[in-house]
A protein has these predicted regions:
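Active-site regions of metal-assisted phosphoester/phosphodiester hydrolases
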Residues: 1-32, 45, 63-66, 71-226
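Charged, glycine-enriched surface loops/patches
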Residues: 54-61, 87
């Protein structure tokens, strides 16, 4: 099973990046794609950004789910809407959006996207995340891990964790999960030479391949096989 994860960074420099993203996805041919910072801007398209990308792929994904639920005012005074999306070659059986706890001084409400996908006759559970870009990201990871444990679920957690040093929080997950960074040291946010994007797989799984997609966004795409 091949999976790609990419923070789209909305429509920034979209005229230069759109074709690169489409070309990359056509090349890697992942079974499932997870996006963060997916915009919906009706001035650009009646489709949200993930749907727009999917419509232009040479082999589009049959199944998709999006949660465009976050609104905020940009620096130029315009309303912006964004969220999380998944594209899948396999049937999406169930999806769920959960709002994470919000600290009073945190500017944005964060959500997670749980999707259950039928892969080869077996139900595989995923959680797509985009945590706060501040110290609360550690707490949000702990909240997600606790929720999954309390539900007695096995999930692959993927997305923009906004945690630069994943080893500093490894005590939260190391007994149950393997991190992508422990398998391959990589940079996912080149402008700061940082690694904010991660994949956590249950410890009984293993990564069989891992690669980066560069110059698609301010984040690099992560593509991995398990």
């Amino acid at each position: 099973m091949k999976i790609t994860c990419l923070n789209l960074a909305g429509y920034k420099n979209w005229s230069n990046r759109e074709s690169l993203i489409i070309k990359y996805l056509d090349k890697v041919q992942s079974n499932i794609v997870f996006f963060q910072e997916v915009k919906y801007n009706p001035d650009i398209s009646i489709l949200n950004q993930a749907q727009l990308i999917n419509s232009k792929l040479s082999d589009s994904y049959q199944y998709s789910q999006s949660a465009i639920s976050r609104t905020y005012i940009t620096s130029d005074g315009k309303e912006s809407r964004e969220g999380l999306s998944v594209l899948s070659k396999y049937p999406i059986i169930e999806s769920e959006i959960l709002v994470l706890k919000k600290r009073n001084d945190d500017h944005h409400t964060r959500i997670i996207q749980n999707v259950d996908i039928l892969v080869g006759g077996q139900l595989q559970k995923f959680t797509n995340v985009h945590f706060s870009n501040n110290s609360y990201s550690d707490e949000q990871l702990e909240e997600v891990l606790s929720l999954i444990k309390e539900r007695n679920q096995k999930r692959i957690i993927v997305g923009d964790f906004n945690i630069a040093d994943i080893n500093s929080v490894s005590h939260l997950f190391s007994e149950r999960y393997i991190s992508s960074f422990s398998q391959s040291k990589y940079i996912s946010f080149p402008s700061e030479a940082a690694t904010f994007d991660h994949i956590l797989i249950p410890s009984e799984y293993k990564f069989t391949s891992f690669s980066l997609g560069e110059n698609l966004s301010d984040h690099n795409a992560l593509t991995f096989e398990i």
